[in-house]
Each structure stands twice: as structure tokens, then as C-alpha cells.
């Protein structure tokens, strides 16, 4: 975000080492926490990609294609994920390093010098002899289990149990307290996010979120 020029006047308190009575700082670049920082960064990286020959997607502005170098790219926040040949990826690496300070997380591929496992947005992606495997961010499941006080050793064999409406009317269920209701919504939302990568829990989570 710090590479994106500020689009409006934003004033901040000076740090202690630069403090001066009656003075403040005016941002020249965007700063985390300001309302338009994410938008300003989007404008910045789109200009960078387009100026280097990429075409922006129509259905999703976060998807890019470079026709000349046959590169596909997806941008999420400040994470860039690309698909292309070694030559094309080397070109992009030099191009973006000339513009920004970047951290290269890895290059997944079949060749001897390629990485066989990389972490992308806290998902683990591995290249194996059988194909590419994709593991969801396990932290979300661990947080849900911990907050519910569930023993992970006691697993269920099916995603849910159908309730007989004749045996269950809901009258014997006590409403959740305010704090419990907030916790339920938070955990259901977290599980809903996790279910995008965990098809085995998708149905159960959908049912949990229906009347949230």
C-alpha cells in the first residue's frame, strides 16, 4: 500500500523522533488503516500491470493476461500469483523488482530446481507425481475446535443427521445469550470461509448459516 500515491489529504501525528509542537504530517503515499488505501493500491498495481503489457480481466479486475509472453496472473491484495514459462516468470520477476520491494515465495513446478511445496494465502499447494494437491488453511479449523471445546479425536462419519420434525419442535431449545449468539455467528462465518476449500464440510456449514 505504501507505493500507492495518496488521493486525498490525510494528516497524521508525527512520530516521537520527528515531533514538533503544533505540527503534523501529510501523507504522500497511502497508509494501512486509511479508508481508501486498498483502492489506491488497486489503481497503482493495475497501472503497473497494464503499462507492462498485461490486459485486465473484464469479469474480474484482479485477473490479468499477457498475450505476448503467455502469462496468467491473479492479484489478491498485495499477493501476485502467476502461471507461465520460466523465461516469462523471470521477466516478470525482474520487472516487478525494478518497481517495488517484493518477496518471492517460490516457484512451483515439475523441474528439478522448482519448489514442490509453496504456501499461498495460508493454503499449502504441493506438486507431486500424481498431480497438484491443495490443502486448506488449517488454522480456521483449529480455532473453531478450540473455541467450541471439541475433542478433535472424536470425529463424525457423516456431515449431519436429519432431524425428524415429529420428534423435534424447537420449543425445548433455549435461545442463545447475546455473547453466545455473537460467537455462533463468528464461528459460522469462519467455517463458511473455510468451506470454500473444504468440500467435505460445505453442506454442514451451509445448514449452519441458513438462519444465522
Where are these regions (language model features)?
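Long, low-complexity, charge-biased intrinsically disordered regions
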Residues: 1-212
